[in-house]
From Swiss-Prot:
PANTHER family: FLAVIN MONOAMINE OXIDASE, LYSINE-SPECIFIC HISTONE DEMETHYLASE 2. Its EC number is 1.14.99.66. Its cofactor is FAD; Zn(2+). Zn(2+) 3 binds at residues 142, 147, 169, 185. Residues 273-292, 564-566, 798-814 are annotated as: GLYR1-binding. Its main location: nucleus. GO terms for molecular function: FAD binding; FAD-dependent H3K4me/H3K4me3 demethylase activity; histone binding; histone demethylase activity; oxidoreductase activity; zinc ion binding. It is found in: Nucleus; Chromosome. The keyword Zinc applies. Histone H3K4me1 and H3K4me2 demethylase activity is inhibited by DNA, this inhibition is released in complex with GLYR1. Binds 3 Zn(2+) ions per subunit. The lineage of its organism: Eukaryota, Metazoa, Chordata, Craniata, Vertebrata. This is Lysine-specific histone demethylase 2.
Length: 822
């Protein structure tokens, strides 16, 4: 059927909303119009033939061909068909033929591009895709603050980050300013630029933007580039080279792809899942929007390509340099894409970056910004917040909110910051944490991020841990492996048992393990030796250390509830300088009031009123409570109105776990000859009643120069030492060491400490656990805010990562995001 042709007087192109456009004519009407006589120009001259774009809703009344590839290019005149890429970008049928027809000069260029696209990409290598990827001109913004106009570059200029950073109106391809003529900035901006900002413009875009040479490309080499917002035509996105797969269009999921490492980037930074990978904490799918992203940016739900391109770019830029705040201005030069859509990308990157900043995905950690460099726009600055507690959770939230530009006051009951982080630097050459010091799983762990920001190195623990019996004999590794296997088998049976059990059917974990163990002995007829029984007790003591409680208080149904969520993978490390380095940096420049225990929180009025025990009053719009679970359970803070029954039930369904530590410095390293460079060694308990006493001894100096050991008291043993003074605990510890190294003389320590977390009035615990009859849901309930006014953070509010400094820190980041959004 013949294409309808319209003939009329040439008109200037100007802005239209699709809603104001006339209804489309039927084919018959269009054909009739094509035969109508032509009008004449106002000056009486002959009219110029032209054709409208046939894309419904396109505002271009007189399209102009951007390609100018064919000698017969229609330019702004008549063509038999316009090909629509966006409301301001079209190419004519003559230029289409130039590349698409095999007898034309441009055909070889098109087919070469098509082969590259097909071998790397997944989407169709259509002529429109070719034009968008290879022929559309680049747009760039003048960097003069008083100008900031968008200019279309000539075809021969390839946009680079350097050009984008330095471009001024009138700049030549060699980046030199044109000879003095007129002020190029005074020239008006192209009218099409204004259209790009309209909400409907993006919906009229035929193809989503695919970034060229994205910083994210090396991290995403195992993906089809066009599925993660990148152009398949760039060498940086050459998937075949990256995966060693030369087969066009096929994606090999090799094992090597699961551990992508980019030179110069911290090996613990792995922000993107690789194909077929799962279960890695703080990882995002580069080809899928997360639920909270869809909620924030619903306009990308149908085609998320632009969002993914910009989000992936932002994440890659952040992890390339996490020591400086990432701003829109730093991202924009790396947005390399042809066409007017680059303008839209630049506009959108600001929104996306602010969202990711608020969520704590970027611009987080110990990053500190000046008063004129707040990370969020002024709309967020009109809030005031009181934070109760200066531990990792409170300081994380305070640092985030302060960086956002929100007024924050921190009230801390103790005479120091850190909460359950407290480092002892009095040992010669070694820092020993009285609280946390070990990082379990470093990949994507925010602690690893903060260490990178501070230039701190962590010591990776080795795997070797010899189990030494009282009497000095090292346990045969085959016995250790056998009992480790049996221990894990017991826990596997517990996992099977709980699958169909409700909370009402819950039993203590210790009771269930004993029941399964006895049933196994009875059914199998296997008899374990006395030593094997003792080694099993060693593994049970480690489980009590992990839970922070004796196993007869822990839920068999929910003891490892967080394992159902992605956890931190990778190395287990010792933070040799201690967590206090991080804590002090988080606190830098914040308004922190020490010795200010809070007595009452009244949130019944328009503002929250907080009163300390000495009667001092503070008021703010929001309050964040980060005190330990034990203090909430004992009602250390009075709430008005009182906390709901649901929240109090959740608070009391968790246990306030407790462990204690002992550290000892010796005149020399007496253990070296037996331990042979291992980072720790185990103590096989002589009986079940002794199993929580000094189960593992840690060598606190990775350099093996200084002579400091640290051990832990867990389970029932915590209660047994509570009535002893420090010297008596030391005597028990030394008696154990002298049994383990019976063949040699063990010297008296020159210095030591014993922690007393259970009796610290403002702490009273180590970390939380789920009590029998409870569930992991309690963590979420405790974390719920009250009326958008009272918020809660701390390890006991983090269902995914409880019991850790990491979990506490992330809960503070989470609440800062919620507070900023209200």
């Amino acid at each position: 059927m013949a294409t309808p042709r319209g003939r009329t007087k040439k008109k200037a192109s100007f802005d239209h909303s699709p809603d104001s456009l006339p209804l489309r004519s039927s084919g018959r009407q269009a054909k009739k119009k094509a035969t109508e006589t032509t009008d004449e120009d106002e000056d009486g001259g002959s009219e110029k033939k032209y054709r409208k774009c046939e894309k419904a809703g396109c505002t271009a009344t007189c399209p102009v061909c951007f390609a100018s590839a064919s000698e017969r290019c229609a330019k702004n005149g008549y063509t038999s068909r316009w090909y629509h890429l966006s409301c301001g970008e079209h190419f004519c049928n003559e230029c289409f033929d130039h590349y698409y027809r095999s007898h034309k000069d441009g055909y070889d260029k098109y087919t070469t591009w098509k082969k590259i696209w097909t071998s790397n990409g997944k989407t169709e290598p259509s002529p429109k895709a070719f034009m968008a990827d290879q022929q559309l001109p680049y747009w760039v913004q003048c960097t003069k603050p008083e100008c900031r106009k968008w200019r279309q570059l000539t075809k021969e200029i390839q946009l680079t980050p350097q050009i984008a950073k330095t471009y001024r109106c009138g700049m030549k391809p060699n980046t030199a300013i044109k000879p003095e003529t007129s002020d190029h900035c005074s020239l008006p901006e192209d009218l099409r630029v204004l259209e790009v900002s309209n909400h409907w413009w993006y919906s009229m875009l035929i193809l989503p933007p695919l970034l060229k040479d994205s910083v994210a490309a090396p991290l995403l080499s195992a993906y089809y580039p066009d599925c993660v917002g990148m152009s398949p035509s760039c060498t940086s996105t050459n998937r075949a080279a990256a995966t060693g797969n030369a087969s066009p269009g096929k994606l090999e999921h090799s094992k090597a792809a699961l551990s992508v490492h980019v030179p110069g980037m911290n090996r613990y930074f792995q922000p993107f899942y690789q194909p077929n990978e799962c279960g890695k904490a703080l990882c995002v799918r580069p080809d899928v929007m997360e639920l909270d992203e869809l909620y924030e940016f619903p306009e990308y739900s149908r085609d998320p390509t632009m969002y993914l391109a910009l989000r992936n770019l932002i994440l890659a830029l952040w992890y390339t340099n996490c020591k400086e705040a990432l701003t829109p201005q730093k991202c924009i030069p790396h947005i390399i894409v042809r066409g007017l859509v680059r303008i839209r990308c630049v506009q959108e990157v600001e929104r996306i970056l602010y969202f990711m900043t608020r969520k704590g995905l970027i611009n987080t950690g110990v990053l500190s910004v000046g008063a004129d460099q707040y990370l969020l726009p002024k709309d967020y600055h009109n809030k005031s917040v009181i934070i109760i507690g200066a531990g990792p959770a409170g300081l994380a939230a305070a640092r985030q909110l302060h960086n956002f530009g929100i007024k924050v006051t921190v009230l801390e009951a103790k005479d120091r910051i850190g909460g359950r982080v407290w480092d002892d630097k009095s040992f010669k050459g070694v820092t020993v944490g009285r609280g946390a010091q070990i990082v379990n799983g470093c990949i994507n762990n925010p602690v690893a991020l903060m260490c990178e920001q501070l230039g701190i190195s962590m010591h990776k623990f080795g795997e070797r841990c010899d189990l030494i019996q009282e009497g000095g004999r090292i346990t045969d590794p085959t016995i250790d492996k056998r009992m480790d296997f049996h221990f894990n088998a017991l826990l596997d049976v517990v996992s099977e048992w709980r699958k169909d059990k409700t909370q009402l059917q819950d039993v203590p974990l210790g009771e269930k393990i004993e029941e399964i163990y006895k049933a196994f002995i009875k059914e199998s007829g296997i008899q374990f030796s006395e030593l094997e029984g003792q080694v099993l007790q060693f593994h049970l003591s480690n489980l009590e250390y992990a839970c922070g409680s004796n196993l007869h208080q822990v839920s068999a149904r929910s003891w490892d509830h967080n394992e159902f969520f992605a956890q931190f993978a990778g190395d287990h490390t010792l933070l040799t300088p201690g967590y206090s380095v991080i804590i002090e940096k988080l606190a830098e420049g914040l308004d922190i009031q020490l010795k200010s225990p809070v007595q009452c929180i009244d949130y019944s009025g328009d503002e929250v009123q907080v009163t300390t025990t000495d009667g001092t009053g503070y008021s703010a719009q929001k309050v964040l409570v980060t005190v330990p679970l034990a203090l909430l359970q004992k009602g250390a803070i009075q709430f008005n109105p009182p906390l709901s029954e649901k929240k109090m039930k959740a608070i009391n369904s968790l246990g306030a776990g407790i462990i204690e530590k002992i550290a000892l410095q010796f005149p020399y390293r007496f253990w070296d000859s037996k331990v042979q460079g291992a980072d720790f060694f185990g103590h096989v308990p002589p009986s079940a009643s002794k199993r929580g006493l000094f189960a593992v001894f840690y060598d606190m100096d990775p350099q093996k120069k200084h002579s400091v050991l640290m051990s832990v008291i867990a389970g029932e043993a915590v209660a047994s030492v509570r009535t002893l003074d420090d010297k008596q605990v030391l005597q028990q510890c030394m008696a154990t060491l002298r049994e383990l190294f019976k063949e040699q003389e063990v010297p008296d320590p020159t210095k030591y400490f014993v922690t007393r977390w259970s009796t610290d009035p403002w702490i009273q615990m180590a970390y939380s656990f789920v009590k029998t009859g409870g569930s992991g849901e309690a963590y979420d309930i405790i974390a719920e805010d009250i009326q958008g006014t009272v918020f809660f953070a701390g390890e006991a509010t983090n269902r995914h990562f409880p019991q850790t400094v990491t979990g506490a820190y992330l809960s503070g980041v989470r609440e800062a995001s919620k507070i900023a959004a209200f």
